[in-house]
């Protein structure tokens, strides 16, 4: 209902139903006749007391809309943001007040979420493996999902809110975010994030889709070369007890919104500088990793060469052992015959040479 009304307001270029809403709020549907002219008492006669006005004959400016804006905001603060968004249909003055309250409500719920998230993070351990098993793990997951929703809503609405073309329209979304945050703060063992955030995801997605499809095309036609800087700047003040509160004063009360935007821009710049530093560190780490990989490849190549050398040495040792065995067998066989005593010194010399070569090869292998 509030979204359809916002679309109609955007097409007409103004909010509410005009200044005549204050007369409707008075409760009198018929025009009262003017009071009779006072009769001057005759000389010597006693003056009669003037009759009191009936409740339906009170001045029409004695209504809710005619109260000061601070009083109206104090009264509306007891209502939900969904009801406040629907009260924009009353009149232009009520539309101005409700717009300010909706914009401030979105900023307040962002600050409340930041406070809750800071409190939960302060109690969580620093290690990621310990966080998963912590009792506040689900609290952190829910708050992270709410942060994503707030970022999407901020990107969708706040561009046009800062341009004073509209306000934060879906008040029901603010109520739902407050409900989720209070549930997280008051529950020790909450449900899973997708169960808690199902309603918030549904209504926020519908609100953003409707805004992009129905209202953004109308607002975009007002963006280029438009002299209208928003209802809060261009609407004349409604006469009443708070007429001294001019439009510029109304706009000055929205300066916290621009301060928040400036703070966010500074935070974005700080985050950008941090990202640049992290990228530089990542590039340095990648260079170190490449150097380590190159050293590992060189070590693998050397290991392969050493393995080949050891294999060749083992083959030579096996061959020398085989020759030594043959020499020893032949020496033993020849020593048994008497006719071959002349060749025994030569055989012994060969055996001695074979043993020496075997010892040298073993020494070489030990050095490797």
Swiss-Prot record:
* rRNA processing as UniProt keyword: no
> Low complexity bias: where?
22-31, 42-56, 333-342
Q: Which Pfam families match?
A: F-box
Location of this chain's protein in the cell: Chromosome, Centromere, Kinetochore
User: According to the UniProt entry, which residue ranges have a biased composition of type Gly residues?
Assistant: 12-21
CDD domains, sorted: F-box_FBXO28 (cd22100)
Q: Where is the composition biased (Pro residues)?
A: 32-41
Tell me the GO BP annotations in alphabetical order: protein polyubiquitination
Keyword annotations: Centromere, Chromosome, Disease variant, Epilepsy, Intellectual disability, Kinetochore, Phosphoprotein, Ubl conjugation pathway
Q: Where is this region: Disordered?
A: 1-56, 328-368
Which N-terminal residues, if any, form the signal peptide?
A: none
Q: Which residues carry this modification: Phosphothreonine?
A: 270
Tell me the function of this protein: Probably recognizes and binds to some phosphorylated proteins and promotes their ubiquitination and degradation.
Q: How does it assemble?
A: Part of a SCF (SKP1-cullin-F-box) protein ligase complex.
Name recorded for this polypeptide: F-box only protein 28
**Organism of derivation:** Homo sapiens (Human)
